[in-house]
Amino acid sequence: MYKKEIFRDLDKKYNSHLYTGLLGFFMNQCHKRLENFSNNNKHFNKILEIGAGSAPHYSYIKHSYDEYHIAETSDYAEDFHKNNPKVKLIKYDGKKLPYEDETFDRIIISHCLEHILSPEEFIQEMMRKLNKGGILSISLPTDPGLAWRLGRLFIKFFTIKKTYNISGEEFNYMNATEHVNSIFNLISIIRFNYKGKFKEDFYPLKLKMSDINLFYNVHIHK
């Protein structure tokens, strides 16, 4: 969850901040739209979700599957899932996924890649863990696009004190240290490395412009 020690106690308030009200509506729609891909009616043997936190994606999945694995870095997320019979959780270092290559039919990473210091290398790491014909599903905020910045400004002045009990300055610092990768750089990395192998979806508008949307979903086929 949150990387900085001073924000660790906010892990417990993550869902009340992101999954309630208008923001919660958009977040839920983002999860639902991540299930819109060409072969989402097939059966997947093994699924891996990376960084599920306290808002796992499995409740949105439309297709059938046999096993649902979660790879996590935080103690809070580990405790959140430890008694869940639906998942097989493993804690890892945030860099190397502790699985054999070509293990999973689908890998899901929702609102995590913007936090990872070496995103290109981590995408390659995820692709190695996919079986041939597998799919990597990525969901991202369009930070620092214009629409996202306007939304963050609203949160800073009207909701962050109520939900997190932190100041606007602390909120700015939290975002500066958490969202270390811009949506523009991440999209460029994906488009350059996986030409002809991906399908994009912008939300809430369909125009492929980060500045006028809030979320970016992409599916990369191996």
Give residue spans per PLM region.
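S-adenosyl-L-methionine-dependent methyltransferase catalytic module, highlighting the catalytic core
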Residues: 8, 13-25, 29, 117-127, ...
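Class I SAM-dependent methyltransferase SAM/SAH-binding core
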Residues: 53-96
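Residues at the starts of beta-strands that form the adenosine-phosphate
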Residues: 46, 66-67, 135
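A short SAM/SAH-binding and catalytic strip from SAM-dependent methyltransferases
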Residues: 106-117
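Conserved alpha-helix/loop element of class I SAM-dependent methyltransferases that forms part
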Residues: 25-44
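A short acidic, Gly/Pro-enriched loop at the edge of an enzyme's catalytic core
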Residues: 95-107
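Conserved class I S-adenosyl-L-methionine
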Residues: 43-53
